Structure formats: structure tokens, C-alpha cells
């Protein structure tokens, strides 16, 4: 303790006696490496700065499996990382404010690609390639998570099914402006 503030290694406990935080402190704040446990059973192991998750870290589901591994900025998932959904599908790419944002690749739980391209606020956006579980795929433009704009829908063998304009996830025979 320095001036009444924790410095060095230490542990903070919940009222019930379970550990809230175990790790490094500087001037009473989480700083350096540590583990923070949350009341819902999830926990974080990684770097802290000024009391916030900041730097490299790993978030875990309450069953102990990995939820997210990558960069944090001021307590938010931001930068590059890997997010694993409860259904086993996962995303590797860029994040902003806790959401998939920028370039990235989404995978089915079996490791095959579900989507590759641009994302904005967790939604497919601009240009990308979406591959369906039956092997068919779409290459083209997206808007708010939907096929929208110019694009081509292929079957699993590469034969064109629809080519042209798409609107709100459907092939459109009408011209889109």
C-alpha cells in the first residue's frame, strides 16, 4: 500500500468470499496482468490499464470455454481478435466498440468459411463472399447484413444461379438505384 492505495500483487473478494480480481495493482487500480471474475460466471484473464481491460486478453464463458481472445481498449473489445459464439461458429478479424467491424472472416463451427469481407457493427457490409451450408455462395455487395446491390449467386459447383441486382437479401429483376 502506498498512500492508502494498493500497489503490487493483490486480491479483491466479493462479499460472499469468492474472488473478484486477482492480479497487479498500481495506485489502487487494476494495472498489468490479472484475472477478473464476473457474477454471471464469465471471467477475463489478461492485461489491465488504469482499472480497465486494456491490451491482450481472453474472455471465458461460465463453462470455461473461450468466448473471445484478442485486443481490448478501455474495457471494450477493440482491434484484432477471435470471437467464438455459443453455437461454435466463430469470427476472426477486426472489432470496434465490442462489435465485428472492418475486415474479417466468419467460420462455421466445422472450420469452413461462412463469410469473408467487410463488416460494420456486426453486419455484412459493402463487398464480401457468403458461403451457405449447402455449398452455394454469393459474391457481391451487402447492406446491413443483407445481399444488396450488385452480386452473383453461385451453386456449389460454380454455376451462376442469379446475377445482377439484389435487394434486402433477394434477387431483384428491377434496377436498383
Label each region the model flagged.
Residues 1-7, 20-32, 43-54, 67-78, ...:
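Conserved anchor residues at repeat-unit boundaries in beta-strand-based tandem repeats, strongest
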Residues 172-176:
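Terminal, low-structured helical/coil segments at or just beyond the last alpha-helical repeat
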Amino acid at each position: 500500500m502506498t498512500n492508502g492505495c494498493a500497489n503490487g500483487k493483490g486480491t479483491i473478494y466479493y462479499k460472499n468470499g469468492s474472488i473478484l480480481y486477482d492480479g497487479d495493482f498500481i495506485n489502487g487500480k487494476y494495472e498489468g496482468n490479472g484475472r477478473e471474475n464476473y457474477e454471471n460466471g464469465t471471467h477475463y484473464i489478461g492485461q489491465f490499464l488504469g482499472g480497465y481491460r486494456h491490451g491482450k486478453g481472453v474472455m471465458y464463458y461460465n463453462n470455461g470455454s473461450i468466448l473471445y481472445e484478442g485486443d481490448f481498449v478501455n474495457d471494450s473489445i477493440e482491434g484484432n481478435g477471435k470471437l467464438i459464439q455459443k453455437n461454435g461458429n466463430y469470427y476472426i478479424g477486426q472489432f470496434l466498440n465490442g462489435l465485428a467491424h472492418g475486415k474479417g472472416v466468419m467460420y462455421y463451427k466445422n472450420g469452413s468459411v461462412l463469410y469473408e469481407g467487410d463488416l460494420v457493427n456486426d453486419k455484412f457490409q459493402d463487398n464480401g463472399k457468403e458461403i451457405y451450408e449447402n455449398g452455394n455462395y454469393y459474391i457481391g455487395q451487402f447492406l446491413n447484413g443483407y445481399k444488396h446491390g450488385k452480386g452473383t449467386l453461385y451453386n456449389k459447383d460454380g454455376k451462376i444461379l442469379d446475377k445482377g441486382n439484389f435487394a434486402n437479401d433477394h434477387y431483384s429483376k428491377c434496377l436498383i438505384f
